[in-house]
From Swiss-Prot:
Disruption phenotype: Prevents the production of fumipyrrole and leads to reduced growth and sporulation, but does not affect virulence in infected mice. Abolishes completely the production of isoquinolines as well as of pyrroles and leads to the production of a single brightly red shunt metabolite, the anthranilic acid-substituted isoquinoline.
Annotated protein name in UniProt: Nonribosomal peptide synthetase-like enzyme fsqF
Biased composition (Polar residues): 739-754
Primary role: Nonribosomal peptide synthetase-like enzyme; part of the gene cluster that mediates the biosynthesis of the isoquinoline alkaloids fumisoquin A, fumisoquin B and fumisoquin C; as well as small amounts of fumipyrrole as a shunt metabolite. The products of the cluster lead to a brown coloration and are important for growth and conidiation.
């Protein structure tokens, strides 16, 4: 029956009116249909609305409903029958009043809109989504953050590097990898890197308490954590490996170069991410989601919300599922992720979005309500999600034209499943997305559907569902429905559904299939977008001492509306039944909000800690004797004013503000308006009072609102560190504002009071007594730091001085070893120092620094031997943490030490405090102003300034217990000229690196003075303050130079091209520079004396210049007394031990063990010796494969061995061409079961090409008994050697190619030695262990081996990433020069500068000219040294490349060469060719 005739309207109107009059009447009796026969509900089918006249713009009507019989009409409840009547009535009314709506009764032929519904699925992985975009738009911006920007190509390179770094550090496919980052572009690099390595991302928010982080680590079983450099130290003791990711730890040049296996294949069914949310059992629950599920979510959301090419605001915390949307949906649709700093995110969001052209944002309604829509001129799409939308929010944003407004819904277990544009009522969410099948079921019986229009629990099916709850199969089973009976009725192939716990219904307002949110089935709530299980809060709160029972509610109305309220019962109940108990308040001084918040802050994230606390006599129970949550929630919601017996807040005890404190009063009133809303009673608690902002109950969203008001009202933005400080009060914030608006007014109270408090107990001291001039026992803090290790060196260099160093560690022995290792790395440690170095295991943050009673008494001069002098150098340098956080490391230990000095009976000789964080000035009159700036500066600057004030006051008080109290104030500190070791993370080096990379510097400040000194000089000043009477109370280290001198130095001496720019233009370029810094230590070349003779070595592949410490070490050895090894006397024992230590360090250089390395005079010698030792493995029936690209020193060893045994060599040749590369495809046909040895080089010394050694090893080791021997001579100067990652059997290289003398090193896998190697040394040495003894022919060149350890330490200090970066630039410049002249030069090998494919060994010939003649002309001019001929590799030169006797020209760089030298060489080469072409 189809109703279309307009003449039926009058009758239908009467029916509608009758129906509505009954619907709106009194409550029905037991049988709702008995008295109302006029309402004829069809017994077989439910109605379906369709358009009367369909136009192109009309949307298809409400999805057709099920046959009523399938719902079990006979089992309909009274409520369901009410719903059916109401639905019919509304449909009739819609038909009656609308020209476009009709309805029909349909049969079973097409019963449901679900028929055959197949959810959209993506069968790709997250990295693939990103890589597809990277291939399509490599140069488009992918990430634009406050700290830099990255294109898709750069993000691809960097994340690839991170992935390979993680593989080297032990990450394996499917392994959970916790991830903790502040907002940064490196956050995106890291998360993609984890996924590309096959890891599963498990985010830990930096703000979460350590206990929660520990729970997540325990749940995931993680052994590796990826973190920002700021967070790395937090996790140091929680897992085996912490991998910091930042601009100075990641470089695209660190791509796969054969050091390790390729990236593992990742499949859609593999886990991608685990999201931890609040759990009702008291610990977070982890939702594991597969790659295919996440990618399906991202694509569905991107299509629904117009993500194509969007510049997306990344606002969500990394622990939210929205975080993945912000990043991967944006990258999948070729957009750009825009990342604000934490301060901009909280307090300057509008400005950031405008400056970064943000066009799309997904935020919570609570946040959107704070923002002013007109402040977002670039915004085109705004999506509300995370919590219920309110009408005032929609009205606010709908008033602005040009912004498309959407609402999204979906728990973390399903991802986005419902979405749509805003409806008239915010409860209407939208339509099911194409990745989801959404069904409403009976909450008490999920196997039963609810009728159309009835409220039901939403269950979601499709490919986007979670895989499981980690380690909790029971919870997974309870949450997921498998093969529900109604799935067949719906005729959908989806068989797995998730129970959301959310109550929804089809909207009867719109009648078009949209879903409407109603409520929850449990006590889970959403609070400012965060999903909270109230049971988890209750679990922890119940453990607060004195709490017998508790209920936590989110108040829906009343005085506490929208607040988390904890209702607790203190003490035992009365003992009787509490069913029907009336709730009544009581006071308990032992349970306060302060106690509660402090207790929970170490257990829960900040957003889960209740704002309010109510203590009651007894909590009620229901008739099942369970806590009656409903009654408690209603009781709280019914409160219309502050209960008289409520727990008093700390702020109510605050002082009243005075009438003249206008700024403070304004702050307090705005605070009251934000927190108390319309409640007059609550406002009175805050207005005109001074109180602690955090303890007043303000939450994270409200603090943003307060900050915006302060900025707008006072024209001054209070720094985030100040407003979020745990000690921030109304008065302290007012003081900051007043100080900014009226210079000269008092500084913030909190820091001034801190400076005064520690000294109040310091009374008068006895008169001073003279002490010995040179204090012989010095206590030193911060000994293991960059400056501290140099102070320690100079102290130990004084033969009568004993040093007592405070060092953190798991034990005293570990602390000692840590400090000694630092000294070894610095290159100055001597074992003789052990008797005068006393390492005290302690911690600056602990009372009395964590020292034992005896040690503390030595500081107090009450135990023998007593400490004579204290150098307080220890502090935590962290520019983003607030003062309160840094106080415990930077202020409290100063107080502790001064208390110890104050308690002395005999005065201390010297107390020296090393300050920092302040601007220096030649004019002492500026010092007070600079100190005042520091007190308003960063948390670090403030903490150092407060400590300095404390020391000054201590020094000025009468009867001081220290003869000398002195302060040393250095500027920037660099490494000394002798060792060239720098703190490369320091600001000054980052500034220089940035300018070098840009090619520009700030010309406006070129005449400004740069206060900079080397560590030797600063340490000397400190020691002078300790030991000399004539030292000043305050010594400013004013050494330095003008910035223009620095820029000139970098240009003239180191070859960097730098040009001045205005400050504004320079800053603009700096902000848009690439994130990967090519940081290099500018004093590095000083380590190589041969570089200062005016000749530039571009013949490095034939032998590098020698590192100074290597030469000096050999000289020291040869001028020392020649004690024999292995004797019983102390001198021999010490020399033997040093030899063993050296072996261990040189083995570690290759990632080998000491018994796996041997030394010889050259690689040729060692490989010949190895060949002799391998003879027992071989016979004439065996086969040897040798690469034709080998250096003859390598190839000749195997040719000779094959000749001796009558074996025919198989030559492994590359495909023909000028770019010869060893291929696995050409190796496979050569391998047979008879293969016993394969030899090749890691890098061709002729063309510089890198060969895939790990893949070669995998192929060779498939043959039982076969060994792989690799010549690494051309690899070793350019890349780290990791024989375990390469999985080779033998590996050899020459140290004279690695900045050392003529000595070579060979690795032999222990198992290969035992299986294949016979000893060739003297018969009486046959039982000696290790490779060196097996191959030793006479004594080693110990004097040359002595030179090697300093080289390994030097390379470690410089860092391989920096070496690769520098060499990549060098080869890029020269290859570009050659490529631009294809008619002049014929290039051999890889023509790109890709560091994954080549090292900077570059060969070419000049077309039409003899290579020998060209090279001779260059060398004769005396400035450059290059090589020509066959480079001791005739087979690749003549047989492969087809060159004649003249061969080729080889130019080879290493990291000490400069760009300027390469450019000069290009000019020189042009000049040489001009003379040759002219016939001169």
């Amino acid at each position: 029956m189809l109703l279309q005739d307009v003449h039926h309207r009058e009758q239908l109107d009467d029916d509608v009116e009758n129906a509505f009059s009954k619907i709106n009447g009194t409550a029905r009796q037991a049988s709702p249909f008995a008295d109302e026969p006029s309402i004829d509900v069809p017994s077989t089918h439910l109605p379906v609305v369709t358009p009367r006249s369909k136009t192109a713009n009309d949307r298809t009507g409400l999805a057709k409903s099920l046959p009523y019989a399938s719902l079990g009409a006979s089992r309909s409840t009274i409520d369901e029958q009410d719903v059916l009547i109401q639905t019919w009535a509304i449909l009739l009314h819609q038909y009656a009043v609308s020209d476009t709506v009709a309805f029909a009764i349909i049969g079973k032929s097409d019963p449901s809109g679900y028929s055959g519904r197949r959810a959209s699925t993506q069968v790709v992985c997250l990295p693939h989504l990103f890589l597809d975009s990277a291939r399509a738009t490599p140069h488009a911006p992918a990430v634009h953050g406050w700290d830099g920007r990255l294109t898709y190509a750069e993000l691809d390179q960097l994340s690839n590097s991170v992935a390979r770094q993680l593989l080297r550090r032990g990450v394996r496919k499917g392994q959970f990898v916790p991830f903790s980052f502040e907002k940064s572009i490196w956050m995106v690099v890291a998360i993609i890197g984890i996924l590309r390595a096959g890891g599963v991302v498990a985010s830990i928010d930096p703000s979460q308490p350590q206990s929660r982080a520990r729970e997540i680590i325990q749940e995931t079983g993680a052994t590796v954590i990826v973190a920002s450099t700021a967070q790395a130290s937090v996790f140091a003791g929680l897992v085996d490996t912490v991998v910091p990711i930042a601009d100075d730890t990641v470089h695209p040049a660190a791509n796969d170069t054969g050091l390790h296996p390729s990236l593992p294949p990742v499949h859609p069914e593999d886990p991608a991410v685990v999201i931890f949310t609040s759990g009702s059992t008291g610990k977070p629950k982890g939702i594991v989601i597969q790659h295919g599920a996440v990618t399906t979510r991202m694509v569905a959301e991107g299509r629904a919300f117009q993500y194509h090419g969007a510049r997306t605001l990344q606002f969500a915390a990394s622990t939210w599922d929205i975080f993945m949307t912000d990043i991967f949906t944006t990258l999948a649709f070729n957009g750009c992720v825009c990342i604000p700093s934490e301060e901009d995110r909280r307090f300057n969001l509008a400005r950031f979005c405008a400056e970064y052209d943000v066009s799309l944002a997904l935020i919570t309604p609570s946040l959107a309500n704070l923002l002013e829509p007109t402040g977002f001129p670039t915004l085109k799409t705004l999506i509300f999600g995370g919590e219920a939308l309110k009408e005032e929010v929609t009205r606010k944003w709908e008033a602005v034209d040009g912004i498309s407004l959407h609402q999204g819904y979906g728990p973390a277990e399903t991802g986005p499943c419902v979405a749509g544009r805003l409806a008239e009522r915010p409860e209407i969410l939208g339509y099911a997305l194409d990745n989801s099948v959404c069904v409403l079921v009976d909450p008490s019986n999920p196997n039963r559907l609810v009728p159309l229009g009835a409220v039901g629990e939403l269950v979601v099916g499709g490919p986007s569902l979670l895989r499981e709850y980690i380690n909790d199969p029971r919870k997974t089973e309870a949450a997921v429905i498998e093969n529900p009976p109604w799935a067949l009725d719906l005729m959908t192939p989806v068989r797995r559904f998730y129970r959301t716990g959310d109550l929804l219904r089809y909207s009867v307002d719109t009648l078009d299939g949209r879903l409407e949110f109603v409520g929850r089935t449990d006590d889970q709530v959403k609070y400012h977008g965060q999903r909270i299980e109230l049971g988890e809060i209750e679990h922890h709160l119940s453990r607060l001492p004195g709490v017998e029972a508790c209920v936590v509610v989110l108040a829906k109305a009343g005085f506490f509306k929208d607040r988390l309220v904890a209702v607790v019962q203190a003490g035992k109940s009365s003992g009787g039944s509490s069913y029907g108990t009336q709730l009544s308040l009581r006071s308990d001084p032992n349970i306060t909000i302060t106690h509660m918040r402090r207790f929970l802050s170490s257990r829960l994230p900040e957003f889960m800690i209740p704002n309010e606390l109510l203590v009651v006599q007894e909590l009620p129970h229901n008739n099942s004797m369970k806590l009656d949550r409903g009654r408690v929630a209603k009781w709280v919601a019914d409160m219309q004013s502050q209960p008289s017996e409520a727990v008093p807040k700390p702020h109510t005890r605050g002082n009243e503000l005075l009438a003249h404190e206008s700024t403070a009063r304004t702050i307090a009133r705005e605070y009251a308006r934000i927190v108390a809303g319309d409640s007059v009673a609550r406002r009175r608690e805050y207005e005109d009072r001074d109180f602690n902002l955090q303890e007043g109950g303000i939450d994270s969203i409200q603090i943003m609102s307060l900050s915006m008001f302060l900025t707008e009202h006072f024209g001054f933005q209070v720094p985030m560190a100040d407003i979020l400080s745990s000690r921030a009060t109304v008065r302290s914030i007012a003081s900051l504002i007043d100080a900014n608006s009226s210079p000269g007014r008092g500084q913030p109270l909190n820091t001034q009071e801190t400076a005064r408090l520690p000294l109040r107990s310091n009374g008068p001291a006895p008169s001073q007594q003279a002490l010995e001039r040179n204090g012989s026992r010095v206590f030193l803090t911060g000994a293991s730091g960059f400056l501290g290790i140099e102070i320690l060196r100079q102290l130990l260099a004084r033969p009568k001085t004993h040093v007592y160093a405070l060092v953190r560690g798991s034990s005293e022995s570990q602390a000692r070893e840590r400090l000694v290792q630092k000294a070894i790395s610095a290159g100055w440690w001597q074992d003789a120092y052990r008797t005068r170095l006393h390492v005290w295991h302690g911690d600056l943050t602990q009372p009395q620094l964590g020292l034992s009673q005896l040690q503390w008494q030595m500081l107090q001069g009450k135990a023998s031997p007593s400490i004579d002098a204290i150098i307080h150098n220890g502090a935590k340098v962290h520019y983003s943490q607030d003062y309160e956080t840094l106080k415990k490391t930077n202020v409290s230990p100063t107080v502790e030490l001064l208390k110890a000095v104050h308690d002395r009976e005999e005065p201390l000789h010297s107390f020296v405090f090393v300050s920092g964080g302040q601007q220096l000035s030649f004019d002492d009159r500026e010092d007070e102003k600079n100190a005042a700036k520091s007190l308003k500066g960063s948390g670090y600057a403030r903490s150092k300034a407060v400590s300095e004030q404390i020391v000054r006051r201590f020094a000025n008080q009468k009867g001081s217990k220290a003869r000398h109290v002195r302060i040393v104030k250095p500027g920037f500190i660099i490494g000394d000229a002798e060792r060239g070791l720098a703190n490369q993370s320091d600001f000054i080096w980052r500034l220089i690196a940035a300018c070098v990379e840009l090619g520009f510097y700030n010309g406006d400040e070129a005449d400004s003075w740069l206060f900079i000194s080397d560590i030797t000089r600063v340490a000397q000043v400190i020691l002078h303050s300790v030991f000399e009477d004539d030292s000043q109370p305050v010594t400013k280290v004013l050494d330095g130079l003008r910035f223009k001198t620095l820029w000139a130095l970098l240009q003239d001496k180191f070859g960097f091209e730098l040009q001045p720019l205005s400050r504004r233009e320079w800053l603009a370029r700096l902000k848009h520079s690439v994130a990967t810094k090519k940081e290099k230590h500018v004093l590095l070349r000083e380590q190589f004396p041969a570089l200062h003779h005016g000749v530039v070595p571009f013949n490095n592949a034939a032998g590098t210049v020698v590192h100074r410490e290597a030469a000096e070490s050999t000289h020291r050895y040869m001028t020392s007394f020649p004690y024999e090894l292995g004797r019983d006397d102390p001198a021999s024992a010490a020399k033997t031990q040093r030899l063993q230590d050296r072996f261990a360090e040189l083995a570690a250089f290759m990632n080998a063990d000491p018994d796996e390395i041997a030394f010889g005079q050259s690689t040729t010698f060692l490989l010949r010796s190895l060949g002799q030792a391998l003879k027992p493995l071989l016979n004439s029936d065996c086969e040897i494969i040798v690469s034709i690209l080998c250096h003859e020193g390598s190839a000749a060893a195997w040719v000779a061995l094959a000749k001796d045994l009558g074996i025919a060599i198989k030559w492994w040749a590359p495909p023909p061409g000028d770019d010869p590369v060893l291929s696995l495809d050409t190796l496979r046909p050569l391998l047979t079961p008879k293969t016993r040895l394969v030899a090749c080089n890691h890098v061709s010394n002729v063309v510089g090409t890198i060969h895939p050694i790990r893949q070669v090893a995998d192929l060779v080791h498939r043959i039982p008994g076969a060994v792989l021997v690799v010549d690494g001579v051309a690899w070793a100067p350019h890349r780290p050697i990791d024989v375990k990652a390469l999985d080779v059997d033998f590996y050899c290289f020459s140290w004279y190619k690695v900045f050392g003398p003529h000595v070579a090193q060979l690795y032999g896998r222990r198992s290969a030695q035992k299986r294949a190697l016979a000893g060739i040394s003297h018969f009486f040495l046959s039982e000696m262990p290790g490779l060196d003894w097996r191959l030793r022919l006479g004594a080693n060149s110990f004097e040359l081996e002595e030179a090697l350890v300093p080289i390994t330490r030097y390379l470690k200090r410089v860092g391989w990433d920096n070496i690769i970066a520098q060499e990549t630039v060098l080869q890029d410049v020269f290859l570009a020069y050659l490529r631009r002249r294809p008619r002049v030069f014929r290039i051999f090998g890889e023509q790109s500068s890709d560091p994954a494919k080549r090292v900077p060994v570059i060969t070419f010939e000049v077309i039409g000219h003899s290579s020998t003649v060209v090279a001779n002309k260059v060398n004769q001019r005396g400035r450059f040294r290059v090589v020509s001929g066959n480079c001791w590799a005739p087979r690749p030169t003549h047989d492969v490349l087809g060159l004649g006797a003249d061969g080729l020209i080889r130019v080879s760089f290493v990291h000490y060469n400069t760009v300027a030298e390469v450019q000069e060489f290009c000019t020189e080469l042009d000049s040489v060719l001009e003379t040759l072409n002219a016939g001169i």
